[in-house]
Amino acid sequence: MSNTAGQVIKCRAAVAWEAGKPLVIEEVEVAPPQAGEVRLKILFTSLCHTDVYFWEAKGQTPLFPRIFGHEAGGIVESVGEGVTHLKPGDHALPVFTGECGECPHCKSEESNMCNLLRINTDRGVMINDNKSRFSIKGQPVHHFVGTSTFSEYTVVHAGCVAKINPDAPLDKVCILSCGICTGLGATVNVAKPKPGSSVAIFGLGAVGLAAAEGARMSGASRIIGVDLVSSRFELAKKFGVNEFVNPKDHDKPVQQVIAEMTDGGVDRAVECTGSIQAMISAFECVHDGWGVAVLVGVPKKDDAFKTHPMNFLNERTLKGTFYGNYKPRTDLPNVVEQYMKGELELEKFITHSIPFSEINKAFDYMLKGESIRCIIRMEE
């Protein structure tokens, strides 16, 4: 047991007091973990677009003050009662979704959508007692998706913590906690392209680049990037993209452009934007008879799309995915090993690295479109 186990820890956290306002480094009190919980010492964290979306709070109920952050790597400081798969000193990745191991989803080999620990962006408390483990001078501070990694210490449900190889560099593998696995798994676990096949990737942000990386790892020979920003093609080449289409450059639907490029359509398509039109295009650009399209991007609340039923009857398949179909505790350690073996290249996703005291720079980089992933070093 650590010498801080069972005690309240005072540490630094970047607190969002208001929507869209710069985070403030504050001293917070972090309560000990309760039954089924883990307290982690965060060493590295990174900024994901989801953090920015809920920090801006333009499309949902604001919940402040709040500690954001959900991509991170750290070390287990202490564990609550009943936690057996983790112990102090273990290297771990907290994840915004979880694996209770008991529900029908966890017992199914096909699903990772745990009934108990599935992501809940509106919940700012722990599920054990509906209370926060963070406070400032007695005032509770809300959690974010059960992780809140913009803090030197955080408390997470044990089912949302993946124990990993202690030799893995936390400043690299921390980015596997969300976006990279979401795109990577959408390709390798759901689309499953065969060696020598063709894959279209819609949207070349971090998730789309990760989907392209999955296509590269799978041995796809043609990886077609589709994006409205042509300058992204040069960067995407590092992730295996070898052809590029900007829909704005054509006077016909992009699915028709791709069909003409590929003699009837690509074998697989992965949509990573959340745009309804991109979803339609991704589905309609796959080849009849065997084509598979996978939707990753999150649409707006009231969005809906339509496509002709013949597109299905002609043996095209449309699938959706959540976190790349990875079970956090079971599968994430294996993804880390793929990196350790050199099969998965993470360094090329990391464009910036800053000290914790400069965390607001990470928001600036993302809002300007200058970063893929910015690593935030907790120890300065």
Swiss-Prot record:
Binding positions (Zn(2+) 2): 100, 103, 106, 114
One Gene Ontology MF term: S-(hydroxymethyl)glutathione dehydrogenase [NAD(P)+] activity
EC number: 1.1.1.1
GO annotation (BP), single: formaldehyde catabolic process
Binding site for Zn(2+) 1: 48, 50, 70, 178
Gene3D superfamilies documented for this protein: Medium-chain alcohol dehydrogenases, catalytic domain, NAD(P)-binding Rossmann-like Domain
Chief localization: cytoplasm
Compartmental location: Cytoplasm
Record-listed an alcohol binding positions: 50, 70
Cofactor binding remark: Binds 2 Zn(2+) ions per subunit.
Record: residues binding NAD(+): 50, 203-208, 227, 232, 273, 296-298, 373
Keywords for the protein's UniProt record, in alphabetical order: Cytoplasm, Metal-binding, NAD, Oxidoreductase, Zinc
Superkingdom of origin: Eukaryota
Classification via InterPro entries: ADH-like_C (IPR013149), ADH-like_N (IPR013154), ADH_Zn_CS (IPR002328), GroES-like_sf (IPR011032), NAD(P)-bd_dom_sf (IPR036291)
UniProt catalytic activity: a primary alcohol + NAD(+) = an aldehyde + NADH + H(+); a secondary alcohol + NAD(+) = a ketone + NADH + H(+)
Cofactor(s) it depends on: Zn(2+)
Entry's Gene Ontology cellular component terms: cytosol
Family: Belongs to the zinc-containing alcohol dehydrogenase family.
Assembly mode: Homodimer.
Protein name listed in UniProt: Alcohol dehydrogenase 1
Organism annotation: Trifolium repens
